[in-house]
Amino acid sequence: MLVIHFKPYNNLKMSFTSTENKHLLGVYEKAINNKFAWKDKIAIAKQASFDFIELSIDESDARLQRLDWSDTEINQLHNELQAQTFCLNSMCLSAHRRFPLGSKNKTTVQQGLTIFEKACVLARKLGIRIIQLAAYDVYYEPHDTETERNFITNMRKVAELAQKYAVTIAFEVMDTPFAGTIVRCLNLIKRIGKANILLYPDIGNLSQFSTAVFDEIALGQDKIVGFHFKDTLPKQFKEVPFGTGTAQFEAALKAIHQYVPTVPILIEMWSKNDPAESTVQNVAQLKQAKQFYEQQWDLALKRVK
């Protein structure tokens, strides 16, 4: 029997007299060396002064297995979070690369829907607020009008499951043209016809498909529940060191400051998973990324003034 006494936000000191607009800052789980146990992952993120970790459920068998965690395993993670007064705020559900909702294979689609429902249950048990969805109709299969139509149809089922479990779902602005901009995601949401599908833009991805990042964020402001902060290059969407890419950080942060100043922001980066890496070294890497992030805010706000 699962017994939960977890307070997902007990690391946050809330003041109802404060009117300061300040967002929570999280870090992607994959930024932390995969060799570390959850106890160490939480400690690393906390020591680097982050507010939460975004849980990864990707297409690998190892991470898909998390959807079948026992109540004992879930309680163990709860206990670690409680002990360190930390939380998981969101889930990056990228498993639909492998099990796309737009597939022409009905078995694959059913697997994708099952994965999503299991993700909703896990999110409920872990106190996760947001499930970020990869807005691919297909990834490894050829895209055409049929895969797009299948995606629209099956996303209606996903939206209904999210309502059933009272979980917030949001499209990530993706690394493919299909959903590479906020405008395109809004168009998909309109076609799906479900108001509970929201947006979780990725600044790096958006920068490669739009020259109007500020305007895109302004347009999507009523739907936005969070942001991924990462650097990118044309045709390279992962593992671009901060400051070496072409992500339009200044425009994005100015828009966030003006239109959605309190939504959570997550620094997305990837550990090299060096077997010899220490917790101290991993903390230092996260702190370095956070410093770059803060510098970008300083630059953006200086020019606002």
Swiss-Prot record:
<protein>
    <recommendedName>
        <fullName>Probable L-ribulose-5-phosphate 3-epimerase UlaE</fullName>
        <ecNumber>5.1.3.22</ecNumber>
    </recommendedName>
</protein>
<dbReference type="GO" id="GO:0019854">
    <property type="term" value="P:L-ascorbic acid catabolic process"/>
</dbReference>
<dbReference type="GO" id="GO:0016861">
    <property type="term" value="F:intramolecular oxidoreductase activity, interconverting aldoses and ketoses"/>
</dbReference>
<dbReference type="GO" id="GO:0034015">
    <property type="term" value="F:L-ribulose-5-phosphate 3-epimerase activity"/>
</dbReference>
<comment type="similarity">
    <text>Belongs to the L-ribulose-5-phosphate 3-epimerase family.</text>
</comment>
<dbReference type="InterPro" id="IPR004560">
    <property type="entry name" value="L-Ru-5P_3-Epase"/>
</dbReference>
<keyword id="KW-0413">Isomerase</keyword>
<comment type="function">
    <text>Catalyzes the isomerization of L-xylulose-5-phosphate to L-ribulose-5-phosphate. Is involved in the anaerobic L-ascorbate utilization.</text>
</comment>
<dbReference type="InterPro" id="IPR013022">
    <property type="entry name" value="Xyl_isomerase-like_TIM-brl"/>
</dbReference>
<comment type="pathway">
    <text>Cofactor degradation; L-ascorbate degradation; D-xylulose 5-phosphate from L-ascorbate: step 3/4.</text>
</comment>
<dbReference type="Pfam" id="PF01261">
    <property type="entry name" value="AP_endonuc_2"/>
</dbReference>
<dbReference type="InterPro" id="IPR050417">
    <property type="entry name" value="Sugar_Epim/Isomerase"/>
</dbReference>
<dbReference type="InterPro" id="IPR036237">
    <property type="entry name" value="Xyl_isomerase-like_sf"/>
</dbReference>
